[in-house]
Swiss-Prot record:
GO molecular function terms noted in the UniProt entry: oxidoreductase activity, acting on the CH-NH group of donors, NAD or NADP as acceptor
Topology relative to the membrane: Single-pass membrane protein
Catalytic EC class: oxidoreductase
Record InterPro entries: NAD(P)-bd_dom, NAD(P)-bd_dom_sf, Polyketide_Oxido-like
Disulfide cysteine pairs (residue numbers): none
One GO cellular component term noted in the UniProt record for this chain: membrane
Protein name: Averufin oxidase stcO
PANTHER family: FLAVIN REDUCTASE (NADPH)
Any single GO BP term: sterigmatocystin biosynthetic process
Subcellular location, record wording: Membrane
TM annotation in the entry: 277-297
Induction remarks: The genes forming the sterigmatocystin biosynthesis cluster are co-regulated and induced on oatmeal porridge or the fungal isolates were grown either on oatmeal porridge or in YEC medium (0.2% yeast extract, 5.0% corn steep liquor). Expression is positively regulated by the cluster-specific transcription factor aflR that binds the palindromic sequence 5'-TCG(N5)CGA-3'found in the promoter.
């Protein structure tokens, strides 16, 4: 009987993964160990998890809920018990300077693997990353836009990079395998309707046409894509796999703009100091005001 672990199941990505595992109808013999910080929040989003499993012949997988911190190796030892694959969907909104959540979770997971009794079964980590960190996909975005996004989300991207370095070292050590999932901008966090997606092989340098990535993808389609990647993990080990939409996406740019603005201001504050940032902002506003006044005059 296959067994998965899912970290971060109450977030937009984790909940879309869990929703597909629960309702796709192809997971009857699957056990999923779900780690969340708040069990009550998970049950509010998925009330059916609080009810007895219908029957032995049900197509719904067996769900085991663990409550705790994803950076605690003791908790992860229990969550990883018998698991052959981990969906790493731990994340936080925005990009606060100094964030280390993803790399700390990776370090705790690797420590938990070291503590597991020998012989260990093989474990594959499906780590959500970003197209901005995949050279093949990032080059498709205008350079100025890419640089602005990387500046605004610098802290979150640095956290992801460090986590990936830890996974690479752990794979070399033989503790685990990993696959990196690189979506474009993600939209419609509360949506559940899928409209279609396609995986992108970023290792085939001759197939440029099929490496093209749309700029938007829904969380719902990302969840299904991550489940497909899980089913094909053996052929994708060590790769960065792109995901692109093939259908319409309900776009929520206002939410993303808020995250970019918050991250950008935080990065400016960190590099130049809040007072200097405020002075610069006032100067820009005065300059714009002067230009508008001169145009009207």
């Amino acid at each position: 009987m296959p067994s998965y672990a899912l970290l971060g199941a109450t977030g937009a990505t984790g909940s879309s993964v869990l929703r597909h595992l629960l309702y796709s109808g192809s997971s009857s013999d699957l056990t999923v160990n779900v780690l969340v910080r708040s069990k009550s929040k998970l049950l509010a989003a998925f009330p059916s998890l609080d009810k007895p499993r219908p029957s032995v012949t049900s197509s719904i997988p067996t769900i085991r809920i663990f409550e705790g911190d994803s950076t605690n190796p003791d908790v992860l030892c229990a969550v990883l018990q018998d698991a052959s694959l981990v969906f790493m969907c731990v994340a936080q909104n925005g990009s606060p300077m100094g964030t280390t959540l993803v790399q700390n979770t990776a370090a705790a997971l690797i420590e938990a693997r070291r503590r597991q009794a020998q012989p260990r079964g093989e474990l594959t980590v499906i780590q959500l990353r970003s197209a901005s960190l995949n050279p093949v996909l990032a080059v498709q975005v205008p350079r100025f836009v890419h640089r602005v996004v990387c500046f605004c989300l610098a802290a979150g991207y640095a956290d992801l990079r460090r986590a990936c370095v830890l996974y690479e070292a752990a794979a070399t050590e033989g503790l685990l395998q990993y696959v990196l999932v690189d979506p474009p901008t993600l939209h419609d966090a509360r949506g559940t309707q899928t409209t279609g997606y396609r995986l992108i092989d970023t290792t085939d340098m001759k197939d440029k046409e099929n490496q093209r990535q749309a700029i938007c993808l829904s969380y719902a389609d990302l969840g299904v894509a991550m489940c497909e990647i899980a089913s094909r993990a053996d052929e994708l080990h060590g790769q960065g796999v792109g995901v692109t939409a093939t259908g319409p996406v309900r776009q929520t740019w206002a939410v993303l703009a808020g995250f970019l603005l918050e991250g950008g201001l935080g990065h400016l504050d960190y590099r130049y100091g809040r007072e200097n940032v405020v002075v610069l902002g006032v100067c820009i506003l005065l300059l714009l005001g002067g230009l508008l006044y001169s145009i009207k005059a």
